[in-house]
Amino acid sequence: MGCLDVRFCRIIFALYSLIRKYGAWLVIPAMLGGAAFLADSVLTPAVSISSAVEGLKTLPALEHLFTENKDLTMMITAVIIVILFAVQSRGTESIGKVFGSVVMVWFAFLAIVGVVAIGNDWSVLAALNPYYGIKFLFSPNNATGLALMGTVFLSTTGAEALYSDMGHVGRGNIYFTWPFIKVALVLNYFGQGAWMLHNQNNPELADAEGINPFFQMMDPNVRYVAVVLSVTAGIIASQALITGAFTMVSEATGLNWMPHLQVCYPARTRGQLYIPVVNVVLCVATLAVLLLFRDSEHISAAYGLALTITMITTTILLGIYLWHRSNKFGAVVFTIVFLAIQVLFFAASMAKFLHGGWFTLLLTLAILMIMYTWNEGTKLERSQRRHMMPKDFLPALDKLHGDSRIHRFADNIVYLTSDPDLKRLDTDIFFSIFADHPKRARAWWAVAVETTDEPFTREYSVESFGTDYLFRVRIRLGFKVSQSIPAYLHQIMHDLEKTGELPNQQSIYPKLDADPGIGTIRYVVIHKALMPESKVSGRGALSLQIKYAIRRVAGSPVKWFGLAPYNPLVEVQPLFVSTRRPPRLTRVASQAPKREG
């Protein structure tokens, strides 16, 4: 799939962005798949690192330590997880350069120890014939029934990690190395199978607890190397999912499915990003999973379900894409074949619902609720958005600008807007200027900020509508450039003052940090809110209330754009409020209060 040649890996959302014009219902599998992927990003660090750390139990020199302290592996895993999330803010570009070499060594090691262990029982190679697998699935000896497929599915996990971190490794490298990885994994599984066949009647292992064929099939001295490599590989796999989660949330924000969050770019490319809030949430959630399930065996029960949901939704979206972009018959065959396999795995994974699958579904539904309510709330807000053309707002603003009876609110009043069109004005801004006491100023500014795909873009456009008191500004900033708006706006005002487009505004109360010729500046941020008299459906009201609750946690433009030190005015404008006059009151004669007794 390779992210379908989208410049930066957008995983499942790339498919949705390409096909959403074919049906509104496609938002359902896209959101569900994205939510499941983010749930997987919580489970992967917990299961991959804990399973690797558990290899320490098989080392003869350390065996007694883990026998005496059952929670030691969990504590070691927790420390590694905390360190992993703590270094995210520094970026992984430098250590990412060695990821490829480490992974190559890891899979080469898997292949070698697998080949050595196959010598225990060469009959294991008969598993190359799928007949034996199908025969055992329906055999009376298979006590677990269809649930066996849930265990089989875990052997495929990790595939999503290979493409979730395109920002580090690139699509071409993944395509080139996939055959090598496939062969290495199969050889290793054959080695584990051969060891189990060889030791099925071993009395020393009959009553042993927590047998791990992967480590047990190796010579005790080799296990030390295996533990180091497996922990390193687990960290790399976790890193891939963490980076993938950052990308997923960033793209969900672009689709208006999640709130605007502070995004940092510690590396030189936009494909490698860091979102502080998401990092903290992932870390806390991963530690919670570790504390709840305590070991990799129990975590794996919850692990597979998220992957099957992601795979099913991706297949549906890709099938729709192929239907509209290529051979329709091929698209149908592809979709049916892959869905048949994936639905089988999903049903098998649901057999583990009570053993951990419930947690995966709960986590997925929680993330899905955030996406759905934010999307619905945004659509409701946009349905109320109106714009005015110059002929509608210029006469009133011109009159207010010259009305000396009204004291100036500030020399410059700056509004932030999400509308990049410089030829019109948000009605909300117009209402804010004239509501109650009109906000008279020497100049009004409506500023929109866009983030570009280039790292260091710094440019702006201005529309003044032929006036010297109203300016629509569009600022375009590269993704690595600070978005502190006040500094840029001071420069823009100074530039316009130099060209004569903005009259000199020398304030009688000069500020220490003011540019020459620039007066006082007041920032206004408009928030939408529901009022008791808002006419909106119950479902719509719930979506908006949840969205605003999330917004309070996620932050606001005051923080994103560096406005906090400038004491911005935050105004609330009601949604879905009728403009009709309320019913008139009837005046009645006053009555004297009755005396008691």
Swiss-Prot record:
GO cellular component, one term: plasma membrane
Membrane topology value: Multi-pass membrane protein
Catalytic reaction list: K(+)(in) + H(+)(in) = K(+)(out) + H(+)(out)
Broad class of the protein's primary localization: membrane
Molecular functions (GO terms): potassium ion transmembrane transporter activity; symporter activity
Keyword Isomerase tagged: no
Bilayer-spanning residue ranges: 23-43, 72-92, 98-118, 143-163, 174-194, 226-246, 273-293, 303-323, 329-349, 353-373
Pfam family, one: K_trans_C
Keywords (A to Z) from UniProt: Cell membrane, Ion transport, Membrane, Potassium, Potassium transport, Symport, Transmembrane, Transmembrane helix, Transport
Source organism superkingdom: Bacteria
Annotated localization: Cell membrane
UniProt xrefs under InterPro entries: K+_transporter, K_trans_C, K_trans_N
Family named by the database record: Belongs to the HAK/KUP transporter (TC 2.A.72) family.
Function of the molecule: Transport of potassium into the cell. Likely operates as a K(+):H(+) symporter.
Protein name from the UniProt record: Probable potassium transport system protein Kup 1
The organism of origin for this protein: Bifidobacterium longum (strain NCC 2705)
